[in-house]
Amino acid sequence: MNITLITVGKLKEKYLKDAVNEYAKRLQKYCKLNIIELQDEKTPEKASLKEEKLIKEKEGEKILSSIKDNSYVVSMDLKGKMFSSEEFSAFIDDLGVRGNSSIDFVIGGSLGLSDAVLARANYKLCFSKMTFPHQLFRVMLLEQVYRAFRISRGEPYHK
């Protein structure tokens, strides 16, 4: 299975880079992981709603150009469906059974995802009603993908 993580913004803190690298290393056994970091657009301190929409649209264009035609796209969205770890594992397994060999997980910028990206998404996923820093969320998502593979194979890790 090919898993691509498409994110807006770059990791800055070393400890987060180390965590991402650790989960990327662990995931090598289960999938081919590709991480695409897209440049975020600068958001003025007091941006108007119109400016925010334009920024999301620009970031959305970058995201859409990074998605392959045959990819199953899962966007991170506060209005998406929440899963337990077991349900998330079953979701990924089911995608594989249905012949989806490429899954793109999309994490938007600080303003979220554009309407065009949300429209392209095959599935909208929500981890929590809380808001997380985008850099930290990247680690959380990779950990849950790793956990999902371990659960589906009945390997020790998940308790």
UniProtKB/Swiss-Prot annotation:
Keywords: Cytoplasm, Methyltransferase, rRNA processing, S-adenosyl-L-methionine, Transferase
EC number: 2.1.1.177
MF (Gene Ontology): rRNA (pseudouridine-N3-)-methyltransferase activity
This protein's GO CC annotations: cytoplasm
Compartments where found: Cytoplasm
Disulfide bond entries: none
Name of the top EC class for this enzyme: transferase
Primary residence: cytoplasm
Residues annotated to bind S-adenosyl-L-methionine: G108, F127, S128, K129, M130, T131, F132
Catalytic activity: pseudouridine(1915) in 23S rRNA + S-adenosyl-L-methionine = N(3)-methylpseudouridine(1915) in 23S rRNA + S-adenosyl-L-homocysteine + H(+)
Entry-linked InterPro entries: Alpha/beta_knot_MTases, RlmH-like, tRNA_m1G_MTases_N
Described function: Specifically methylates the pseudouridine at position 1915 (m3Psi1915) in 23S rRNA.
Record-stated family: Belongs to the RNA methyltransferase RlmH family.
Assembly and binders: Homodimer.
Protein's UniProt name: Ribosomal RNA large subunit methyltransferase H
